[in-house]
């Protein structure tokens, strides 16, 4: 049981790039495909009193598809994240979070740059 807890702590502590590499390894070597949606859903309030929804202040910029101009998207990802060429290429090919926890203005700016380069992007 302690080994499972240690493994869970290591997985939670992965960087974005390490998580992308883990996804690729699980897919290529073990044939494990990521679940649709890829997120764990939390249960809502049991009493039905949701109250007023709070406005989201932090956003994650998620690359859904690099599109036909993958080279342009890689260049933009490098500029946005500061990653090296190989790391940016791996991130673009795997898809996923480009930036986490950014304010709405920055998230919209990044989304605009990536979409101008030909990528399909969503804010979460």
Swiss-Prot record:
One of its GO terms (cellular component) is cytosolic large ribosomal subunit. SUPFAM superfamilies: ClpS-like, Ribosomal protein L7/12, oligomerisation (N-terminal) domain. The keyword Transmembrane does not apply. InterPro entries: Ribosomal_bL12, Ribosomal_bL12_C, Ribosomal_bL12_C/ClpS-like, Ribosomal_bL12_oligo, Ribosomal_bL12_oligo_N_sf. One of its GO terms (molecular function) is structural constituent of ribosome. Keywords: Ribonucleoprotein, Ribosomal protein. Transmembrane segments: none annotated. Pfam families: Ribosomal_L12, Ribosomal_L12_N. GO terms for biological process: translation. Belongs to the bacterial ribosomal protein bL12 family. Homodimer. Part of the ribosomal stalk of the 50S ribosomal subunit. Forms a multimeric L10(L12)X complex, where L10 forms an elongated spine to which 2 to 4 L12 dimers bind in a sequential fashion. Binds GTP-bound translation factors. PANTHER family: 39S RIBOSOMAL PROTEIN L12, LARGE RIBOSOMAL SUBUNIT PROTEIN BL12M. Forms part of the ribosomal stalk which helps the ribosome interact with GTP-bound translation factors. Is thus essential for accurate translation. This is Large ribosomal subunit protein bL12. It comes from Jannaschia sp. (strain CCS1).
């Amino acid at each position: 049981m302690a080994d499972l807890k240690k493994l869970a702590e290591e997985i939670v502590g992965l960087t974005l790039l390490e998580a992308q590499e883990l996804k690729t390894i699980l897919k290529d070597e073990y044939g494990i495909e990521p679940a649709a949606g890829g997120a764990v859903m939390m249960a809502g309030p049991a009493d039905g009193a949701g109250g007023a929804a709070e406005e989201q202040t932090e956003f994650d910029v998620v690359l859904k598809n690099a599109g036909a101009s993958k080279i342009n998207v890689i260049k933009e990802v490098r500029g946005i994240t500061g990653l090296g060429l190989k790391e940016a290429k791996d991130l673009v090919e795997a898809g996923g979070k480009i930036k986490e926890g950014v304010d709405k203005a920055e998230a919209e700016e990044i989304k605009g740059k990536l979409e101008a380069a030909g990528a399909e992007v969503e804010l979460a």
